[in-house]
Design a protein with these regions (language model features):
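Conserved acidic carboxylate
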Residues: 9
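Two-component/phosphorelay signaling modules centered on CheY-like receiver
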Residues: 12-30
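Acidic, metal-coordinating helix/loop segments flanking the phosphotransfer/catalytic sites
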Residues: 20, 31-50, 55-58
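Short amphipathic alpha-helix used as the core "switch/output" element in two-component signaling
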Residues: 40, 64-76
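C-terminal output helix
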Residues: 89, 106-116
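As written
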Residues: 93-102
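The C-terminal output helix
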Residues: 116-124
């Protein structure tokens, strides 16, 4: 079974480079440029094995809003929060939600490892 990931990142170069890297690892990737787009995909797609979301994005919904929407629909989905604006408070909030927290710049091999190991554990 193929791992399916939703990648939410407003920076187009970061999003595209990350998506290309994950696809080369045989991961199916859907992309969203903002929180609203991501929430629409979450509510209309059957399932995601993992969600990777930037914290700060333009628009109404931020990364934690996206993660909360995913967890309401599928609490077992692996969620990874990525931010260039890290703080102990943000990290604690993410961990309280059961979310993997990574600060930018993110190592793509590390991200792939988190996706594959966590998605495998959470897939029924």
């Amino acid at each position: 079974m193929t791992t399916r990931v939703l990648l939410v990142e407003d920076d187009i170069l970061t999003r595209r480079n990350t998506a290309i890297y994950l696809r080369r690892a045989q991961i199916e990737v859907d992309e969203a440029a903002n929180g609203e787009e991501a929430i629409h995909l979450i509510t209309s797609i059957d399932r995601y094995d993992a969600l990777i979301s930037d914290l700060r994005m333009p628009g109404v919904a931020d990364g934690m809003d996206v993660i909360a929407a995913q967890q309401r629909i599928s609490p077992r989905t692996c969620c990874i929060l990525v931010t260039g604006f890290g703080s102990a408070q943000v990290q604690k909030r993410a961990e309280d939600f059961g979310v993997i927290y990574l600060e930018k710049p993110v190592s793509l091999p590390e991200l792939l490892n988190k996706v594959t190991s966590s998605a495998t554990r959470t897939t029924p």
